[in-house]
Amino acid sequence: MNSENALLQSDILAYLEQHEQKDMLRFLTCGSVDDGKSTLIGRLLHDSKMIYEDQLAAITKDSKKSGTTGDKVDLALLVDGLASEREQGITIDVAYRYFSTDKRKFIIADTPGHEQYTRNMVTGASTCDLAIILVDARAGVKTQTRRHSFLVSLLGIKHVIVAINKMDLMEFSEEVYENIKKDYLVFSEQLDIPDIQFVPISALDGDNVVNKSENTPWFEGSTLMKTLENIEIGNDANIDDFRFPVQYVNRPNLNFRGFAGTVVSGQIKKGDKITALPSGKQSTVRSIVGFEGEQEVAYTPLTTTITLEDEIDISRGDMIVKSDNLPLQSSAYEVNLVWMDETPLMPNKQYGFKFATKFVPGSVTDIEHQIDVNTMEHKEAVRLNLNEIGVGKIKLTQSVACDPYTKNRETGAFIIIDRLTNSTVGAGMVIDAIQDSGTKTEYSEFELEFNTLVRKHFPHWNATDITKL
């Protein structure tokens, strides 16, 4: 039992107050098959004293049936929750685990290492601040390592810890560690990952995971847990660009009209000049109302309600920004695309696009190229299949305000929705806006009448009014 659990049992109020003050780090583990991702998470939980006795007894029993570690307790069984995963000894789903230490709270996403589960990894990585990339000390930097690193870079994760695992099988050789470190740094020069750190570990035995290992006297860095506790992520937040997607109009009575939502980046204070998009109408912040009443300032990631001096038309899906700091605004964008559905992405097919709180119909008009996630080569493509990634152009039925994903992960991301099944079939990241050409398609009388007929008698098809395209 760690000190936190002891405090929890003795003084629940003191525990809650202490817990409330900690910041949170979201991170994912990724690596090739059998690199030890689930074992590492189990080791972090075990050595941090975050496993209860009944859990330990259960996995000790299960280790004899499903374990892969001989006489040792298979800590990977703490995370591999699905029966099919245990039987195959692999991770399929994205498994989330929550734990905390005296310094920080953590959410771990254990993501699949297989290429056919790329969409699962993208889902797990989309909300993370840091990635732990496991490398098998016996194999070094492999194709899968490059693929995972590319995906981490694509999704805007700025901090990477390369955990060189199974060092016990290489007799904790410093030469092996340095060679892998050198190979990875050479490869990573073509990626946008500003902070890369390395740790030699043995997840099975716990070397350099939570406790410093006596087997690596040549390693002067911190253990994996200490690195996770001390890494600074506060500077990653976008505090310059105020973006406030409106979730709903809050009107409890005739005397109050506010706009509720989450500050996804930046900050706002009373008296600031704002612009509502897409209308472009301007006003001034009258008040900011939070859970405990009025406040002078609101900043990311607070959920709040903003009232304005002027009665301007704002509804769900609109975005409130500072008048002197406007985002991109266009109905056409160049984007990175990740396809997540078994039915391929087909250009010019109508989909739904969801940017923050705004839903707008549109289509992918062009696939410029597909990106080979293993080699990062660009290939010609006329469609994207399940788990494939590409660069393309989207055309929306109305203008949408957003930022490049590299500048703002919250307003630069979107999901693609199948309008018949309402399932999420893809995800995207904005690269840049494409200026509208101003040309308008001419439709025949028959096309106009047919479009009107479909929208009138088959509203569940969600057909777009082509006169507004």
From Swiss-Prot:
Residues 202-204 are annotated as: G5. It catalyses: sulfate + ATP + H(+) = adenosine 5'-phosphosulfate + diphosphate. GTP binds at residues 31-38, 110-114, 165-168. Gene3D superfamilies: P-loop containing nucleotide triphosphate hydrolases (3.40.50.300), Translation factors (2.40.30.10). It holds the Pfam family GTP_EFTU. Pathway: Sulfur metabolism; hydrogen sulfide biosynthesis; sulfite from sulfate: step 1/3. Residues 110-113 are annotated as: G3. Residues 22-236 form the tr-type G domain. It comes from the Bacteria. One of its GO terms (biological process) is sulfate assimilation. Its EC number is 2.7.7.4. Residues 89-93 are annotated as: G2. GO terms for molecular function: ATP binding; GTP binding; GTPase activity; sulfate adenylyltransferase (ATP) activity. Residues 31-38 are annotated as: G1. Keywords: ATP-binding, GTP-binding, Nucleotide-binding, Nucleotidyltransferase, Transferase. Signal peptide: none annotated. It is an enzyme of class 2 (transferase). InterPro entries: CysN_GTP-bd, CysN_II, CysN_NoDQ_III, G_TR_CS, GTP-eEF1A_C, P-loop_NTPase, Small_GTP-bd, SO4_adenylTrfase_lsu. Residues 165-168 are annotated as: G4. Belongs to the TRAFAC class translation factor GTPase superfamily. Classic translation factor GTPase family. CysN/NodQ subfamily. With CysD forms the ATP sulfurylase (ATPS) that catalyzes the adenylation of sulfate producing adenosine 5'-phosphosulfate (APS) and diphosphate, the first enzymatic step in sulfur assimilation pathway. APS synthesis involves the formation of a high-energy phosphoric-sulfuric acid anhydride bond driven by GTP hydrolysis by CysN coupled to ATP hydrolysis by CysD. Heterodimer composed of CysD, the smaller subunit, and CysN. This is Sulfate adenylyltransferase subunit 1.
